[in-house]
Structure formats: C-alpha cells, structure tokens
Amino acid sequence: MYKRQVPEYSNEDKAICYGITGGVAKYLSMIDPRKSIDENIIRLFFRTDGYLYDETRNLLTQEFSDIAVVNNIVEQIASGENTLNTIAGKIGEKEQTVLYSLDKLINVGLVEKKKCITEEKNKKKTQYVLKDYMFKFWYEFIPKATSVIEMGQGEVYYERAVKPVLHSFMGSVFEEMCRYYTLMKGITGEYGCFITSVGTWWGVENIADKNGNIRAQSADIDVVALSDIDKRAVIGECKFKNEKIDKGIYETLIRRGSLITAKYKISKYIFFSLSGYTDWFETLSDENVLLLTLDSLYE
C-alpha cells in the first residue's frame, strides 16, 4: 500500500509520493529518484508534456460518455461537496442523474461512499469522497492552473500556489494511512482487543464556553477502529503539519472519545504526528495513550 514508494526518498516524501499517485505502480514508475519530490510533481503535473497533466481527462473520456456531468461531479467532490443533494444543487442536475453517475464512478474505483463507522446504516451520514488520490490532487490544483501551465509557467504556479498547501492536501491522505496502520496492528490484538473494522466518525458535540453557556459544534474523529467482539474501540488523531501536536489536541481527542463510549469502551488513544510533540507530553503518564510519528508507519 503506502509503503510501496520510492525507497530513496525520506518518509515524508514517500508519503507525498503516495498522496499524488495513489500508490499506482504505473505512476510510481515515472518518479525519478534522482530528482526531488517537487521536481517530479512539476515534471508530471505542471507541464503540458507531463504524463499526468492530461491523464485524468483521458481516463474519464475512456470510461464515460456523459463526460461533462461526470467532470462536474468530480470537481464538486474535490472541492469538498460530499452529499448527493449538495452536489446536485451545485451542478444544476437532478439527484437521480447525479446518483447514476456516482454509481459508475464508484464502480470504476474513483469515488467511494464514506460512512460514519458507528452509524453505517444511517443514510444521512453518507458522504462521497474521491478514492483515487491522483484524481484528488489533479482536481484540486490543475483545473485552476491550466492557463498558467499552458503559458509555460507551471513551475511558478506550483511554487507559489501548491507547495505552500501541500501538507494541507496531505491531511486526508495521512488519515487514511493511519487508519490502515491501525487496522493492521489491531487485527493482531496489539491494542488489547481484536480490531475488526476501521473508519472515521463525525457528528455534534456540546461545548461550554467560559460563561457556562452550552453550544453545539461539529466534531470528528480521524481514526476509529472497532472490535465488535470485545465492544472496544481505538481512536486516533492525525496531523500532517510542521507544527508539533500540543496539549490542546490531546484534550480534544480525549473529550471526543466520550461521544462513542455509549457503545464501545476506549482501549487506546493514538496520536499520529509528522513533526512530533511538545514538551508537555513528557509529563504525560498514561499507558492507554500512544504517541506515533510518520516514521512509525514505515517501520
């Protein structure tokens, strides 16, 4: 999976490599290990002769006849619209038309249904997300840069508009990597229970402000691994950022764990960080908390 990358690269660059190719062997073979990850991204995506510059258009044209509708749907999902009614509303199509195209996109592996892991039968908690990371990267950055790339200024665009937000793009990729890692460890019983499924959770939590007033706010948990045999759960928070994880992030995950404890007892709280942890964690003594880094995923 994510480990099948360019061995010469650092683990951070390996992860980014996975994020822009989805781990597809064909695309990985085009990465030149003698060049930096930035040089490879520019060469493949941000030049008119780059192989991946036109790859998404070519693949969609081969698979779909209603290319305009499909393209609009994928653009909306890439921009963050993830429910049937919002996608249909944004592109001005009937929900049945959009659903038909979504089903085809799912069948060819470009889109998947994402469900809240503790409420998988709740249709209202279904989101559509891009499953293919190469498509996700392309749709997030290339369409708005086409004119600049065709003027031969793709490298400038990448340096100014893409590279500064590359870690942000990698956020959801890193979360998926961490879920996979958690499942692989969990099926061996490493967390004190036998993990049978992994996913994510989202919903609403009630927060008290400094005056004691209660307000509702949206909440999510990046990694939720469940043991339906033991009725236990492992939950995690993932940060692919240059900043270290601090006490506030720790407290948020601990608090949000209470949102699923009606059904499952929390066995472990796992933190995954690209850049490590603040000094506060040196004083933390809790055997139920695991502090991992990106390097942990590649061991």
Question: Over which residues does each language-model region extend?
Answer:
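Amphipathic alpha-helical "lid/sensor" segments that cap RecA-like P-loop NTPase cores
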Residues: V6-L59
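Winged-helix-like regulatory helical subdomains adjacent to P-loop NTPase cores
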Residues: I37-G89
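Short amphipathic alpha-helical interaction segments
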Residues: I91-V108
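A short, conserved structural fragment
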Residues: I106-I117
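A cross-kingdom feature that marks ATP-driven nucleic-acid transaction machinery
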Residues: T126-E299
